[in-house]
């Protein structure tokens, strides 16, 4: 009996001191570009759009909102600039979402005043700090992690100081082919260079699907 009581007491002590992690997921129109100062990797993402957070720390994600929108009688891809979102972790699971964008008017309104919502699965809204991450130069996504590190060191509204030193510009194993070596793009126009860049960013399965799709376009 004494042994059982001691064992139960030990379990209670451990559960009271160990930080419980919540799971963060996102709406289908959100892509995670960075999670707590690092590029998303297989070790960070449990699935395509989910990862764990500690309930004792503030967390930061950089997201991009992407939607197929109507532009007159046509349809086109809208992609937002990177948005930094900082929020406090919780033991509850969390959903990060963006409003649905269906028209060019919706996209322009969102671009002017972006709003990313962070809520628990029970519907309680979590306070956030958010703003665009300033990007410069050609193919700015290549330097996103370095820009984020500088942002976190700047004391900006959504900055997290502890991530300024932990941000890793270097490759993270398991995140795809492009992270294993230098990315080189060559082409006669920006569209061709962008295709080369995103192809090198993709994992092997995505590259294969893209090649199959491209062959079907001939």
Swiss-Prot record:
It comes from the Bacteria. Keywords: Signal. The keyword Signal applies. Residues 1-21 form the signal peptide. Belongs to the UPF0319 family. PANTHER family: UPF0319 PROTEIN YCCT. This is UPF0319 protein PM0395.
